[in-house]
């Protein structure tokens, strides 16, 4: 026989379960924190991962130089990238052994070139701005956007900087401090030999004796 305390506890539990939808009122709980939105272009790590991890076999074959496009069995017959209806592996492509030939390079470049484009700066101007050891290029007659000033003054500056450059490029600090490169410190003048000094002393002694 069930006691009255157990019956009261069970009834209270049923009442709480019945009132729970009314308390929530059918509305979901608000999110605790707003989700952080990633940038439109993505970070460098995400771009590199997109290059290294293609989504499908089609993109894999387009990005990998060693693997040709996938051809199902029975399609294409003697296609250069297939061998008896099967996809040629990387060993056949790299060694030249087999019935298929090496496919042409993709238009977008290899994986290494795509990763280097992500990591390296876009232009020489941004590279010179980020590198403290290399200054901006000084070119005679430059200044197409703002008039460029006097051309003779630009030529004088270019002649002045001829001793500070190496094959048209500015020498870095290492070349100046260690004398490595095409600009070297001039050799010191040779020291006077002892022969003229001895002749002068002999002449002075002979004049005193006379």
From Swiss-Prot:
The tissues where this chain's protein is expressed are given as: Expressed by the venom gland.
Q: Which UniProt keywords apply?
A: Disulfide bond, Hypotensive agent, Secreted, Signal, Toxin, Vasoactive, Vasodilator
Biased composition annotated in UniProt, kind: Polar residues: 201-210
Alphabetical list of InterPro entries matching this protein: Natr_peptide (IPR000663), Natr_peptide_CS (IPR030480)
Q: List the disulfide bonds.
A: 83-99, 166-182
Stretches for region Disordered: 122-210
Quick one: where's region Natriuretic peptide domain 1?
83-99
**Region feature (Natriuretic peptide domain 2):** 166-182
What PROSITE patterns does the database record attribute to this sequence? NATRIURETIC_PEPTIDE
What is one GO biological process annotated to this record? Answer: regulation of blood pressure
Tell me which positions the record assigns to the signal sequence.
1-26
Q: What does this protein do?
A: Natriuretic peptide that dose-dependently induces the rapid relaxation of rat aortic strips phenylephrine-precontracted. Acts by stimulating cGMP production in a dose-dependent manner (by probably activating NPR1 and/or NPR2). May also show potent hypotensive effects.
Q: What is this protein called?
A: Natriuretic peptide Oh-NP
Originating organism: Ophiophagus hannah (King cobra)
